[in-house]
Amino acid sequence: MACALFIAHWPRKIKPRKDERQLVSNIDIVPTILFAAGIKPSASLPGINLLDEKAVAKRNTIFLSNFAHDMVSATEPEKSLWTRSCIHGKWKLVAWIENPPNVRPWAGGHRHKNPDTNLELFDLLADPHETKNLANAHPEVVRDLAARIDDWWKVD
């Protein structure tokens, strides 16, 4: 899983490194910039300071969501929600929302690789391009990650 969140150059402040196994998110950008500017962010602000190597190393779970990116329901984002996902360790579970209201399917009628199931499980170390759905082979992992997703954001 190789994805650059962002690239920063700050001599004597940021050590050069390439780390493809740490979980980072766009929610980490604001806390990192605030810490770099000497401002302590509010405790209620989500995300971690990416300059704090211990905090980054400690994180082993991250949640993701995909939306239609329209303004149909800016105050109710679940109305244009396509997926909720959880990465925990080497595993990534993608929970697709079937036929969300106000969202048209992509060309061809399907929005994801496997239209036969709403759940896709990937081993990101063995399959970084997410081509092999392992949900049927690892139902215990699916149950665990699905529960984590629902604890994070339950959708009716």
Identify the residue ranges that each predicted region occupies.
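The feature captures the short pre-catalytic strand/loop hairpin that immediately precedes
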Residues: 7-16
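C-terminal cap/loop subdomain of S1 sulfatases and analogous C-terminal strand-loop tails that border
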Residues: 14-15, 22, 27-30, 34-120, ...
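Intrinsically disordered, low-complexity polar regions and short flexible loop motifs
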Residues: 127
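Second-shell loop/turn segments in exported
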Residues: 17-19, 133
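Catalytic cores of eukaryotic secretory-pathway lumenal/extracellular enzymes that build
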Residues: 3-4
